Amino acid sequence: MNVGSPAPDFSLPDQQGRTCSLSAFRGQWVVLYFYPKDDTPGCTTEACGFRDDYLAARKLGVEILGVSVNSPESHAKFSDKYGLPFPLLADTDGKVASLYGALWSLGPIRFARRQTFLIDPQGRIARIYRKVDPGSHTREVIEAIRLLQHAAK
C-alpha cells in the first residue's frame, strides 16, 4: 500500500455495535488509525490526543476512525472511560489491519500495529505514518491535513 493508492474499503462494528464502512466517509478526509489494545498507556495517550484535537479535526472536515482487534464491548468501555467522541472499530479477526499492512502477530496473539493512514476525499491514501509517537502524533496529523488541504486548493 502506497501514497496515492485507493484506500481499501471495509465495514466493521463500532463501540455501539453499529456497522461503519469507510466508503460512508467518501467526500471528506479520514484519519484511519490502528492501535494495539484498548486502555493501555500508549493507546490511551493516542486516543486522548485525538479526543482533544477532535473539534479542530471536525472544523477541517475530518473524521477520525480508530481500529484495533478488541471487541465492540471493550471499545465501548474504553470510549466511555475517556469520553472518546469518534468511532472505535472492532477488527476482531484482524482482516482489516492485515489489509492495511498493520497486523502484528506474536505466535497466536495478534495486534494492530500503531499506524495511521490519512485518506483524502476521493478515497486515496494521502499519507502513511508507520512509526507513531502517541504523545505528539495527533497534532502532527492535524497539521499534515491542513497542509494537504491547502496544497489541494
Give, region by region, the residue ranges found by the protein language model.
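Chalcogenol-based redox active-site neighborhoods
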Residues: 1-153
